[in-house]
């Protein structure tokens, strides 16, 4: 029997409340001190762990201290600096390209709306929503691999398409909770609902998860 939207919304409330109680301090785990540093870190985080990114940016942000430094740097040198994050050639080009546009078109300020953010080289909805939520306090959802996997397990979505998932979840979870939800799901995905070996017996939402094996 197909679950009604009203019932999904009720389950979504339960999921949020339970995870919030379990991970009250959940927050962005990327290291940054400015909007532009978060932009760089988020670009580097694609197909890479936040832990690795933080190891790299610790020295990177001492070497490149402003958007201008990234915009006018030697991209081959930048590529070497971010090598351990993977896909270093593409990521370095994206970072330099985005930084150049920020410097030349936005006065060195990272844009504060989705359309302008996704116009930056290498910036998609995931990175843009991260910036909007973390820096500008605009309710938004970052659909990463944890969100895709766990929301499918919860049967709140039946697709792997990040944009479709984003809009489906917007209809289920309260607007004010969108940013926090992402961090809760990421923490839960790392600690309990681990890919290929979820710890359903230790899960605080196993009673309302259709995929739970207890």
Model region roles, listed by residue range:
Residues 2-214:
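Catalytic cores of DNA base-excision repair glycosylases
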């Amino acid at each position: 029997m197909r679950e009604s939207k009203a019932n999904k919304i009720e389950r979504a409330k339960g999921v949020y409340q339970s995870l919030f109680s379990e991970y009250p301090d959940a927050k962005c785990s990327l290291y940054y001190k400015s909007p532009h540093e978060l932009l760089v870190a988020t670009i580097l985080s694609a197909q890479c762990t936040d832990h690795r990114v933080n190891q790299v940016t610790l020295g990177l942000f001492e070497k490149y201290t402003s958007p201008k430094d990234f915009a006018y740097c030697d991209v081959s040198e930048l590529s070497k600096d971010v090598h351990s994050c993977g896909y270093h050639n593409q990521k370095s080009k994206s970072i330099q390209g985005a930084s150049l546009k920020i410097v030349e078109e936005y006065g060195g300020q990272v844009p504060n709306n989705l359309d302008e953010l996704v116009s930056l080289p290498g910036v998609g909805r995931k990175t843009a929503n991260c910036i909007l939520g973390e820096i500008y306090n605009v309710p938004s959802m970052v659909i990463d691999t944890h969100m895709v996997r766990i929301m499918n397990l919860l049967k709140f979505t039946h697709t792997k398409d990040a944009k479709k998932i984003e809009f489906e979840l917007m209809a289920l979870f309260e607007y004010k909770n969108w940013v926090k939800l992402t961090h809760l799901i990421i923490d839960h995905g790392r600690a309990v609902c681990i890919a290929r070996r979820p710890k359903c017996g230790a899960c605080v939402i196993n009673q309302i998860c259709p995929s739970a094996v207890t």
